[in-house]
């Protein structure tokens, strides 16, 4: 009996290592990406993308960055949706049991909350800090979309929305503390502050000069027909032998 399995069900799993996480991952909208295009730490600006979504970036040596743009409907008044933009970055660790733990730099997180029917058109800009923990994750090749995907699982084990590899190496802001405060243990000198601003500004100015390569989906249909042709040639050769 011949069993046909849809191509979309195939997924090649990749073992959980830091190098597998490396890159910038974005949700299906493909409009939200980490880096200076989402948050400008010099001007303290969160930049609204065209569509809602979420993006995570990871380096191979343990740093992460998060960009989130969410819009929630208001069932009581559909004309009053709530929108929020969130930026965080810091370090991450993959535990022995596969748990992925994100530890943000507390003073650097930012949130922009918009409630147009309650805030009189003035959004609320504030600091934001939220450590995150994922029970596990899976990096795999999703052959339906033809892209590497990152599946995160929440603390309860439930799968979250999949993310797809957009850039490798990742597009990120500098991994250092971007907005140190006077209460920090290591207070920067004036020269250090100037160096920090210069470093961040160069990152922003070079946003279009990154060596990160945008990942695009291969032509799956082309490989499908190519494989079919090879099978046909092989069958004819077998019958003639």
Curated annotation (Swiss-Prot):
Recorded GO CC terms: endoplasmic reticulum membrane
Topology of this chain in the membrane: Single-pass type I membrane protein
Keyword field contains Signal: yes
Lumenal topological domain: 17-222
GO molecular function (one): unfolded protein binding
Location(s), subcellular: Endoplasmic reticulum membrane
Keywords: Endoplasmic reticulum, Membrane, Signal, Transmembrane, Transmembrane helix
Bilayer-crossing regions: 223-240
Cytoplasmic side: 241
Primary subcellular site in the record, as a coarse category: endoplasmic reticulum
A biological process from GO: 'de novo' protein folding
Signal peptide interval: 1-16
Chain's role: Required for normal levels of the cell wall 1,6-beta-glucan. Involved in a protein folding machinery chaperoning proteins acting in various physiological processes including cell wall synthesis and lysis of autophagic bodies.
Similarity-based family: Belongs to the ROT1 family.
The protein's name in its UniProt record: Protein ROT1
Organism from which the protein derives: Kluyveromyces lactis (strain ATCC 8585 / CBS 2359 / DSM 70799 / NBRC 1267 / NRRL Y-1140 / WM37)
